[in-house]
Amino acid sequence: MDILIGLLIIAIGSFCQSSSYVPIKKVKEWSWESFWLVQGVFAWLVFPFLGSLLGIPAGGSLFDLWGAGGAGMSIFYGVLWGIGGLTFGLSMRYLGVALGQSIALGTCAGFGTLFPAIFAGTNLFEGNGLILLLGVCITLAGIAIIGYAGGLRAQNMSEEEKRAAVKDFALTKGLLVALLAGVMSACFALGLDAGTPIKEAALAGGVDGLYAGLPVIFLVTLGGFMTNAAYCLQQNIANKSVGDYAKGKVWGNNLVFCALAGVLRYTQFFGLEMGKSFLTESPVLLAFSWCILMALNVTFSNVWGIILKEWKGVSAKTITVLICGLVVLIFSLVFPNLF
């Protein structure tokens, strides 16, 4: 029962993250860099900070926890993850919600599982290490199939249909950006690993296992915010869009929807940490929890892609290929449990 509860919590967080781009469509009169920065304030600073407060032992502080070790590396990996988050947003811009998230999150699922194992010295050619490696290979196969579906989609759609579904649709550029986003986004998992001493200190201080990892998440998202804020402000200056923040008549509307997008985006990590606390009885599921989250994100993002009509006008063959790719990705998560 605990495992089912853990998976359900992760699934809820995944659904929220995959829904985070829907409120963004309600933002008015702001350039991409402006709304990305404002939603980032909520997604990577405000809500992670509030969540981290739940992981502080009685009579302690965040600084006490961070002093346990690993804080600097968590922030560093967060900076790298921030590059992934930034290019992740660009992949949505060029490919749309469905295809962009599928490729970026699929790549992130594979490398986010493999990188921690490599750094931990795991032998990838025997035992559990081999299972991890094969699971990643299956994940990458799913990505390739989804990429092929994107190619079919581009061939079968007119220029007008492409622009109607995704304003800045650009397949080649989008694929490259999405792959980079996936690899760099996998650094989030490394940031969590680096912060293990902090989580252990929280547990030793009597914090419930549900919340013990939240102070580490704040460090990783803090690093990510640094990267994204620097880029967005540079783009504000280059594109002369700084004036977006002075458009008082849309501030109320835009702030609400950016905050909503931010809390939805953060919920995936909040749910991941809470869900993992229920998976301790299954080491395999615990090791693959990152992959589980990413695969669910891919599934839900494509559901939103269909709802938002991003696949409108494509052939039945293209949809079939897309579904096959998703099935392969989902199988990559089931695969480790077969042994």
Tell where the protein language model's regions lie, with residue ranges.
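Polytopic alpha-helical membrane proteins, predominantly small-molecule transporters/carriers
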Residues: M1-F339
